[in-house]
Amino acid sequence: MAATQHSVKISTGALNLYYGSFHALRDISVDIYDRSITAIIGPSGCGKSTLLRIFNRMNDLIHGVRVEGRVLLDSASIYEKNTDVTALRKRVGMVFQRPNVFPMSIYDNLVIGPKHQGVKRPQELNAIVEVSLQQVALWEELKDILKKPALDLSPGQQQRLCIARALAVKPEVILMDESCSALDPESTMKIEDLMVELAKQYTIIIVTHNMEQARRISDWAAFIMIDQDKVGTLVEYAPTTHMFANPQDQRTEDYITGRFG
């Protein structure tokens, strides 16, 4: 897709991450733009998912993780001691590789977040459910079976439900970690179409091994690979059309053309 330059939503500078003494990411500096899709690409083990999880501090859940450098959301640091991490994760939602619906009804999956934020009136909750499902094109399919277990849905429906659950708390950014890799081609196409539509309102950052997917739907692409010290580094960051048509680094060209990966 052609990149349209919006305002910067997330910015990193001299960003490093360590797992104990292991240096996982080195000196990552990127500006991620609002209302766009940014694809993080690179070989397995280079730190793509680690970088993605920095943006809503999911790495905090791993013992021994240390982050150095600058990570800004709307120009405000998200790694201050007084950062409200719960509020951050409301603003920056996440959808994982495999559908992780909760073992409860479709309806309860969607209202659990809003209820946690204090929404109690049934009318408000019902409206949130309808709007969230409409956003992921599931309302017509599910409106008559909302009390059925979410686990009864197909994998593709479950993944769209997970996206709807993230949308129910009104995020600004949506992180998607290989969110189509466990789905069949038809479900993948629906999720891709959904991402393009959602990018009109939200900032979307995806991790993908699928170069054709990155080429099809992303506006910007960040290519990461490990260096000679086995540390993940940013090789190239550019509008996707530019990177795929005219990569500026030989390693980028070798990766996107399938010479390694």
Annotated model-derived regions:
Residues 174-177:
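Catalytic Walker B motif of ABC-type/P-loop ATPase nucleotide-binding domains
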Residues 56, 107-116, 126, 130, ...:
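Short helical segment in ABC ATPase nucleotide-binding domains corresponding to the A-loop/adjacent helical element
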Residues 226-257:
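Conserved beta-strand-loop-alpha-helix hinge in the C-terminal portion
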Residues 170:
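Conserved catalytic motifs of ABC-family nucleotide-binding domains
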Residues 148-153, 157:
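Conserved ABC ATPase signature
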